[in-house]
């Protein structure tokens, strides 16, 4: 399952590590957009297979940032 961003911004902080088992709505990373912190959460439970961004990266709305099993 691909996880995408809902807003454009900068990856401020990564909260989850590859290989972690995530619960529904668990925070994967936090974006900074217009001086607001916006969490990107797991839409379902599963193992985090891949992170496609790192802290400091700029993302656009709809960019894939992570892959969940």
What kind of region is each of these model predictions?
Residues 1, 25-27, 45, 51-53, ...:
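Short, surface-exposed linear patches
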Residues 23-39, 60-69:
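Short hydrophobic beta/alpha edge segments that flank linear recognition/processing sites
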Residues 8, 19, 37-40, 45, ...:
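A short, glycine- and basic residue-enriched loop/turn
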Residues 1-10, 27-43:
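Short beta-strand-turn/beta-hairpin segments enriched in glycine/proline and small hydrophobics
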Residues 7, 13-17, 21, 50-53:
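Short histidine-centered loop motifs in beta-beta connectors
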């Amino acid at each position: 399952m691909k996880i995408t961003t809902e807003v454009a911004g900068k990856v401020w902080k990564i909260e989850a590590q590859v290989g972690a088992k995530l619960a529904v709505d668990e925070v994967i990373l936090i974006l900074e957009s217009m001086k607001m912190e916006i969490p990107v959460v797991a839409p379902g439970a599963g193992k985090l297979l891949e992170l496609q961004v790192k802290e400091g990266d700029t993302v656009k709305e709809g960019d894939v940032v992570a892959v969940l099993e």
